[in-house]
Amino acid sequence: MKEKFKLTKLERNWILYDIANSAFTLLVSTLIPIYFNSLAGSAGVHEDMYLSYWGYAGSISTILVAIIAPICGTLSDRKFKKPIFLLTVLLGCAACAAMGLTTHWLLFLGIFVIAKVGFHSSIVFYDSMLPEITTDKRMDNVSSMGYAFGYIGSVIPFVACLVLVLFCDSFGMTMGGAMVCAFLITAAWWAILSLPLLRSYKQTAFVDGEGAPLKDSFKQLVRTFKEAKKEKHVFMYLIAFFFFINGVYTIIDMATAYGSALGLDTTGLLLALLLTQVVAFPCAIIFGRLSAKYDTGLLIKVCIVCYTCITVFGMFLVSLWQFWVLATLVGMFQGGIQALARSYLGKIIKPERSGEFYGLMDICGKGASFLGTTLVAFVSQITVGIEVNVFGLQLQNENLAVGSLVILFIIGYLVFCKADAMSKARV
């Protein structure tokens, strides 16, 4: 009889942080874009520009994280992983709570950028802990369970926030007041559930370093690139990751803004994205279980192909029921591709170099996110007022912008096939 998979205490605490930060991720992909559209609309910003400004804000945050990530990676591989991880968590939580302090749309975007920088910087440290808190054999399963419980756990604070926002009149509140409460609830959830990992994690894998870490960070980044180029399978994988995760992150970040820009019902959009979280929970666990039976590389290829099809479907989205279908399909593969991509890297690198390589992976991920959000924002902006008839459907600028992501999934798939073949040849 097969032994039941049981998590260790450290693995459980590591997964708890996924539950903690996923509350912010869910808020970013649901309520925050809608609230921003409300602020921008009240300030006289044209509705055709909502998606563009939102996309540019996401792009700015990813540029900043790409600059910071090498420093995070270098510090992570020394003996500073835990204290700097704490600082990034505090930055993200504080900025999240502060987002309710302004009703000026541009200042709101500025605070939002700071919150995203704190969030993504903490993820560099968090991901780099994975090779230390578990074994190679358990890594796929633990990584998948992190995403799975992150999806379902984040529903708890989100439902509380959603009830406050949708029924704010019944509570004697304005939408702005309800959003202030939503930001505070999310920040508190994020901070409190971070504590178990902060208390129990002890860094065991590190390299000795002398000199100033900040000064050495970008030198280390160059060395890491050179090391990755020597390890050609790692280098090719990071290139593939850059392209395929591009579409994944962009769809996550801009789903609500996309639906809102198309004029779809706000309540329906939020409930559909709540469905995404519920669907993602069992599907992420299933992918973790499948990784014990099937090759991780094969599963990643399946996810990329499915995401390509999802993007094509999303391009033709014109009604709410189609958004519900899109939300369900995204939920089926979102957790799987993120979890397997994270653990795949952990298997092909040395544990003591995990910080710098996961920092490099984060640069690739954020660079991809920058490319994706900028691409969507740019295409949306230059095609304002243009309608294209395809199969009898009138596609607007937002539809065309989403369709532009398909080519990146295709490139990611082709490069990953090459990288996976190279990795297998080394075994």
Locate predicted features:
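Juxtamembrane intracellular "pre-TM" segments in multi-pass secondary transporters
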Residues: 1-11, 202-238
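Helix-loop boundary and gating motifs at the non-cytosolic
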Residues: 5-62, 233-272
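A membrane-interface helix-boundary motif in multi-pass transporters
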Residues: 47-48, 165-188, 378-409
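Helix-to-loop junctions at the C-terminal end of transmembrane segments
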Residues: 67-80, 282-296, 380
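Structural signature of the two symmetry-related core transmembrane helices
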Residues: 83-98, 298-313
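Helix-loop junctions at membrane interfaces in 12-TM secondary transporters
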Residues: 100-112, 315-327
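Glycine-rich segments within core transmembrane alpha-helices of 12-TM secondary carriers
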Residues: 143-165, 362-373
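Multi-pass alpha-helical transporter architecture, strongest
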Residues: 189-200, 402-427
